[in-house]
Amino acid sequence: TRPELVAAGELEIRLEADAGARTLSVWDNGIGMTREEVVQNIGTIARSGTREFLQAIREQKGQMAPELIGQFGVGFYSSFMVADRITLVTRKAGETTATRWESSGDGYELMETERDVAGTTVTLHLKPKDEEDGLRDYTEPHVLRDIVKRYSDFVGYPICLKADTLNSMKAIWARPKEEVSEQEYRDFYKHLTHDWNDPLDHVLVRV
């Protein structure tokens, strides 16, 4: 074992929204990344497909199609659908310095910085709310609660907004059927299939 890689405290994910600054930050105290890992895993603006994806977003005025994400296979850069700029600060467990990565979609800047504990923070500098373009206000607590419940309820670590834990951390297939609502079944189906319609029916099978 490597004790320097053990997280400070229990592993968790925090959402921090600032309506005045128009930012949404996702913070964790996981293992973090080195500078080299940031370049390899995040600094992919110039890679094949990514520039085309960002260009497609700009051309999708009024139609923020989620299918673009699957088409180009660049999940992290789908953040540019809701943000003009992304800032990432990460510190690898066992290291004393952190790395700051920032991009507006046309390349990126990389520099050394500080972070109190190991882990990663991704900050989205949000575009203005635009209902016609499918952009909700991602600084609103009820919007964040809805998104986490719909898409991340069974993530195995707590996702917190201030003092509240937003997810159950238990997959619906591992819960007693009487504890799972019809809406949860419908939401889970849509999450898996990306189908906007409700399922015709559901069948519970235990093996």
Role assignments for model-derived ranges:
Residues 1-138, 146:
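GHKL (Bergerat-fold) ATPase N-terminal catalytic module, capturing the glycine-rich phosphate-binding loop
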Residues 68, 86-107, 127-207:
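GHKL/Bergerat-fold ATPase module in large chromosome/replication-associated machines
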